[in-house]
Amino acid sequence: MKIYYIGILRIGGEKALELTSARDLSQFSFFERNGVSQFMTFFSETVSQRTQAGQRQSIEEGNYIGHTYTRSEGLACVIITDKEYPVRPAYTLINKILEEYLSLHPQKDWANISATNASFNYDNLEHYIKKYQDPSQADSIMKVQQELDETKIVLHKTIESVLQRGEKLDSLVDKSEALSSSSRMFYKQAKKTNSCCIIM
């Protein structure tokens, strides 16, 4: 599971404008990185421009999926992942990023600009692209599910060890039943012996 790109874009006019972005291109060779980076920007601008406000879309392109959400303010976030990255954590992260970005850069700051500049950068994107390579970090439900799965594994191990003990307990129970049978046998034998010698 891998996140390759996170971008925040201003929607409106003829073309979307990338305000800030972060990329993890470590899986690509040095010579591919520039072309891949340009393609990711182009893909993000195209997809976000064609996503209506309030709508979420996941678009598959080759081995990659672009998850996008456009807010009513005209701000969109695009995350490009591989096909294995779960959808819910991607959208959870998109919502988080857009909320934080809007609190730092209100709509009036970027609504009417024609070109981006360093003042629109959002340094947390670099942190997020590293941290959220593990999708359970973005999605608390997924994190709880992962913890439950781990607990389930521990419980299965505990149950297996109890069953092994249980097998030993069963053999003890069998032995105690055997004692009980021999005790019964002794009792019956003693009863027979006592019954044949009746004193008159």
Swiss-Prot record:
One GO biological process term: autophagosome-lysosome fusion
Lipid modification (S-palmitoyl cysteine), residues: 196
Segments forming domain v-SNARE coiled-coil homology: 140-200
Keyword Membrane found: yes
Signal peptide coordinates: none
Sorted UniProt keywords: Cell membrane, Coiled coil, Lipoprotein, Membrane, Methylation, Palmitate, Prenylation
Propeptide, residue positions: 198-200
Longin domain segment(s): 7-126
Lipid-linked residues (S-farnesyl cysteine): 197
Entries under CDD domains matching the protein: Longin, R-SNARE_YKT6
Keyword Nucleus among record annotations: no
GO MF term (any one): SNAP receptor activity
Subcellular location: Cell membrane
Pfam families per the UniProt record, alphabetical: Longin (PF13774), Synaptobrevin (PF00957)
Topology of the protein relative to the lipid bilayer: Lipid-anchor
Family the entry assigns: Belongs to the synaptobrevin family.
Name this polypeptide is given: Synaptobrevin homolog YKT6
Organism of provenance: Debaryomyces hansenii (strain ATCC 36239 / CBS 767 / BCRC 21394 / JCM 1990 / NBRC 0083 / IGC 2968) (Yeast)
Gene, per the UniProt record: YKT6
